[in-house]
């Protein structure tokens, strides 16, 4: 079985309709005999609630002394949320 890497950016997972389209593309790859590896970005664009830039801004506004570990954790939150939904 061939591996197919599918990358979906923020707007590709920003809405329920867009996520359904992503699901359909992944399922089509499976039906075509591929083993998909799906990579997703955080949902939306800068300024939207779950976009990486927005999450980092919230962290920096509430904590002026952000350490690297906290920043790394916040930076992956949007992608984790997108992968879950």
Spans of model-derived segments:
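Nucleotide/pyrophosphate-binding catalytic subdomain
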Residues: 1-85
């Amino acid at each position: 079985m061939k591996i197919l890497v599918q990358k979906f950016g923020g707007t590709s997972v920003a809405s329920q309709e867009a996520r359904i389209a992503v699901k359909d593309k992944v399922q089509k790859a499976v039906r075509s005999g591929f083993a998909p590896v799906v990579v997703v970005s955080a949902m939306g664009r800068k300024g939207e609630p779950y976009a990486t830039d927005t999450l980092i801004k919230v962290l920096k506004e509430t904590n002026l002394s952000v350490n690297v570990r906290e920043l790394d954790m916040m930076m992956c939150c949007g992608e984790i949320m997108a992968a879950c939904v």
